[in-house]
């Protein structure tokens, strides 16, 4: 007996390592922070580093910053909504708010000194990037200790981070410390902050926070001192530790509630939210209840969650993922699932979001739809925390979605198809900061990125696609994968050549459009001609349904694949010779005559995102 075993070698690309030991004090009267960082930085590269860089994100929250000007410029572009309203192309949370901040509302981050071996280093500020000119270079394979003294003013909540948000949360503390810029095989990733994406160095965090003793604190990492002692100034001292992460977030508020539960061995889920009333209590209790229910499914589909805890925290301005935690404006489960899934596709895999936003947001959007559908279909109506009216709405939603194609992923496909027809589409490979419009960026990263996973299910088969996502996670967790890395795992999983698919889908805006071209009598069969109208070649499935109630699926693999997929469903699959990608038409023969045919349809599953389906189906009258 021969056993076929598919092995995935672990990649050996070098990456940097960092350990942070941060001690910071928050003055809740002045909204200021003073702190120190002790950093151990390991240069695992083959390069000698003569400079290093730090992110100073909060400096974006000042009038005429890059973020401010960029937002106001985007607001000059307008779109017409589905309701016919004129909509500005800026992020509605940012708009022109930064321009109108008062000095006491600014975000300010300042590094006073950085010393290495007792020697002060030269500091050059570039708004949200701090350049550090080293007195001695950091040699390959060496470790250096840096001591950083910093101070900051917490901005009023505008985007992601800040104080006193719309829901009344006192402090949502993300991007709050001088964070070292990632250096990788492409060099330093010194992207000025304009409210888009993040990328960080894998490391270990030991964070001590000091503040007013009336405040509750939670966030990334595991609390080391649950009793939180007082320091000499009467402030509570909180100490958190987290390992193999690339960011650290926390909240502080003096009117929060805290729920927690060990949902499986080695994993405790936490929920922190603003105290208000019994209705709010039920809504946040439902978050914990639902999270426990979907966790086994998430780990089955995406891989094991490796950290000892995860926290759902009310804060911020919508939903934003961080290491071992998320900030959420409210308890809506769609956002809850989305941000939690980011733990896999961003905080465990750690792709460069600026270059590959679709590998984060797109894969997460796909996962959100999958997990939400699973939850609503299997558990939602069992929740003790939602009303009977809400349960009826969920049942109606599940029934409505059952008639939408492609199944489960209808929203992503719809968003992508609207983008493809809008005239504003740019390639997914565009740097996240440099899309011409927010509309193009968001639909490329979220909708087109999510559609890509659905499309892979069409090309390689859904069982292979599901295996791909697990193989990708297990091969590349904690290793900063890029687009080529993902496609190589897809090729190894499927046995197909898929570089062509990546080039067309990621690096171009070419669209898929196929149509039924001609039908002719051919003795006891029919000759059906299919035409490729768009510039994007694909393998094609055509289902022929006969008047006797039988059906057959005619499958034409694309020559670029150098292979094909196995039969997926119950319909008999007839495999035809490969379709040469440059040929605009393809003709195949049915097994029954033309007068026996009831209908012919290209891709009835609608997993192939065809921009014009009006020519994909024909009903033949009696």
Give residue ranges: language-model regions.
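N-terminal, polar/Ser/Thr-rich
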Residues: 7-34, 63, 499-500, 504
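Ligand-binding face of N-terminal immunoglobulin V-set domains in extracellular IgSF glycoproteins
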Residues: 32-60, 65, 80, 88-92, ...
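Extended, low-hydrophobicity, Ser/Thr/Pro/Gly-biased non-transmembrane segments
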Residues: 78, 82-117, 122-127, 149-251, ...
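Hydrophobic helix-coil surface modules that form long, contiguous segments used
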Residues: 180-188, 194-337, 366-369, 378, ...
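Beta-strand-rich binding/interaction modules
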Residues: 218-219, 512, 519-581, 593-603
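Zinc-dependent metallopeptidase catalytic helix centered on the HExxH motif
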Residues: 326-406, 469
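Amphipathic alpha-helical substructures
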Residues: 433, 439-528
